[in-house]
Amino acid sequence: MSSSPVVSRDILEELQLYTAQNLEKLEVNKYYEVIRELGKGTYGKVDLVIHKIRGSKMALKFLKKKSTKLKSFLREYSISLYLSPCPFIINMFGIAFETDEYYVFAQEYAPSGDLFDIIPPQVGLPEPVAKRCVHQVAIALEYLHSKKLVHRDIKPENILIFDKECRKVKLSDFGMTRRAGSPVKRVSGTIPYTAPELCDTSKHDGFCVDYSTDVWAFGVLLFCMLTGNFPWEKAMPSDTFYEEFVRWQKRRTGAVPSQWRRFTDESLRMFRKLLALEQERRCSVKEVFAHLGHRWMLDGTSGNHHQSVLNSSSEEDELLVDRMKQQTLSPTANTSNAIEPGSANHFTSMSTNSSVSSTNSYERSARDSPPTSRILVTTPIEICV
């Protein structure tokens, strides 16, 4: 196990180097038919396209050269490709190129959008649907963590769905992903998913990336899915709802916080572990597997519990590099050598959160069949129910 971080480091660096050496400048319209824009933002856009040679739908992610360093583009693309063997992580087509204005890569298209679209505000998803989604996201995070990587931007906008019942979901957007233990600069601003240790403005020197921040965000995500609300606006003493939760976590009061009273004792035990105030005391995301067979909501029903096993090996890593080297990054590549996702008709979307915590903040364009769900609101009045 001690050699795993070194293996991951070498492979990611090799993928980045290979991509940089083979990055071609192309005209998008020559190889793709643009169907529509899926989203746009400060850093770029995402288009739904049809590959003129393969005839397959895919999503092209465009990152503006003016605001994106080549190093950042290469890192996001390489990490995405490196993680794509996991069936619960968005798949890649092995296509990366540049235009005069953008760095571009292609990934699969999910027709049902993202998780944010289907969570009814102040209601939440039915418990069986939420459990299906949570189970798959937990597997994806366990896989990512087994590769010594931390996502750092877990939220509904970054979980793509392939049907409204969440029978198939995938984790996406690895622009913020870094190796565990890497030093990073402190980011100004917070979102409800930000762990308390990252909200501490008294620490100005930055911090080291840690798995526990993903665990915290995962716990908040679970709350949002089940309730349609955020538990707080920010994990800071100035937030009344967070402080109420802190008193309960520290067992200074026996009363369950008002917005947590809808949960069963079993699920509250799960939340205590996922949202431990001290990061070293947080459990891993796989802790949720032990609770899938129990009821989570006082007025809900239990979903089905299916055990899943993660198999991660260095052989799998080497196979990915070999596949990468056997093809060109160009969209003109022979289709027989291309890396194809496991299924067609997928969608990728970017984060809609305007927080500077994400390097990829996008506004989603209207779809042909817009979802009926409203936007999750984050004002204090809406949070406390």
From Swiss-Prot:
Region listing for Disordered, in residue ranges: 328-374
Catalytic activity: L-seryl-[protein] + ATP = O-phospho-L-seryl-[protein] + ADP + H(+); L-threonyl-[protein] + ATP = O-phospho-L-threonyl-[protein] + ADP + H(+)
Active-site annotation: 153 (proton acceptor)
SUPFAM superfamilies (UniProt xref): Protein kinase-like (PK-like) (SSF56112)
Bridged cysteine pairs (disulfide): none
Tissue expression profile of the protein: Mainly expressed in brain.
Gene3D superfamilies on file: Transferase(Phosphotransferase) domain 1
GO annotation, cellular component aspect: cytoplasm
InterPro entries: Kinase-like_dom_sf, Prot_kinase_dom, Ser/Thr_kinase_AS, Ser/Thr_kinase_Sbk1
UniProt effect for mutating residue 61 to R: Loss of activity
CDD domains, per database record: STKc_SBK1
Role: May be involved in the control of neuronal proliferation or migration in the brain of embryos.
Record-stated family: Belongs to the protein kinase superfamily. Ser/Thr protein kinase family.
PANTHER family per record: SERINE/THREONINE-PROTEIN KINASE SBK1, SERINE_THREONINE-PROTEIN KINASE SBK1
Protein name from the UniProt record: Serine/threonine-protein kinase SBK1
Native organism taxonomy: Eukaryota, Metazoa, Chordata, Craniata, Vertebrata
